[in-house]
């Protein structure tokens, strides 16, 4: 196992334990609003602190980028740990048991290691560049769908960017006529992990942040899928507009989305 993957798994499991314990004692959870329709809890912060501490013990020189506390610049900026300590905070607050810890390691701009951990199901999704993706140690392969017929697609509503609401609904309408059904779970990290596992056939979302998808992106790629922006390019790291699935599913999704995209979403 890649040495950084070992530490990422250790950090994810420790954070997962913090999350699971607090899920059982909801009265101890303190939630606040940090932005429009965007929440944070004391549990997000506690899980993040555990992850940072675990990384720092082994790699004190590395840079860490987190959702809640921003960038912790290290002396080695070529290595970045990109962390979402609790992806699916709203689900957690509402006691809907679907959320995950997401940790990715990027070296010189390429994601090399990925972990997405679901503490409620004890499902550990891992990937190392060039070595495949796994779920609890078993090799993952994504969907073998040849087009959108019969597929289940996952998505997330653009609740932080409601200026795209009409465009988003139009895209959903276009895709829904071609696929079998949609799922909207509330955790982009798990959506991408589920694409890697073949539980859903494709995924798209508007305006994600790097910590939402950095780990999930590598899981998808290492399970035989591809990830692109809304025009089939690679600008999703900047825009957060992301489409994922096997090559044929992504091609079909992009073809259906194309005519509905505003200029802002074509970047």
Swiss-Prot record:
- Which EC number(s) are documented for this chain? 3.1.3.25
Question: From which domain of life does this come?
Answer: Bacteria
> What Gene Ontology terms describe what this protein does at the molecular function level?
inositol monophosphate 1-phosphatase activity; metal ion binding; RNA binding
Cellular compartment(s): Cytoplasm
Name the keywords, alphabetized.
Chaperone, Cytoplasm, Hydrolase, Magnesium, Metal-binding, Ribosome biogenesis, RNA-binding, Transcription, Transcription antitermination, Transcription regulation
Q: Which reaction does it catalyse?
A: a myo-inositol phosphate + H2O = myo-inositol + phosphate
What are the GO cellular component annotations? Answer: cytoplasm
One Gene Ontology biological process = inositol metabolic process
Kindly list the positions annotated as binding substrate. 67, 86-89, 183, 212
Task: Indicate whether Protein transport appears among the record's keywords.
Answer: no
| Keyword Transmembrane found | no
What are its cofactors?
Answer: Mg(2+)
Which amino acids does the record list as binding Mg(2+)?
67, 84, 86
Record NCBIfam families: PRK10757.1
Described function: Part of the processive rRNA transcription and antitermination complex (rrnTAC). The complex forms an RNA-chaperone ring around the RNA exit tunnel of RNA polymerase (RNAP). It supports rapid transcription and antitermination of rRNA operons, cotranscriptional rRNA folding, and annealing of distal rRNA regions to allow correct ribosome biogenesis. This subunit may play a central role in organizing the structure.
Into which family does the record put it? Belongs to the inositol monophosphatase superfamily.
Q: How does it assemble?
A: Homodimer. The rRNA transcription and antitermination complex (rrnTAC) consists of RNA polymerase (RNAP), NusA, NusB, NusE (rpsJ), NusG, SubB, ribosomal protein S4, DNA and precursor rRNA; S4 is more flexible than other subunits.
What's the protein here called? Answer: Nus factor SuhB
Organism per entry: Salmonella typhimurium (strain LT2 / SGSC1412 / ATCC 700720)
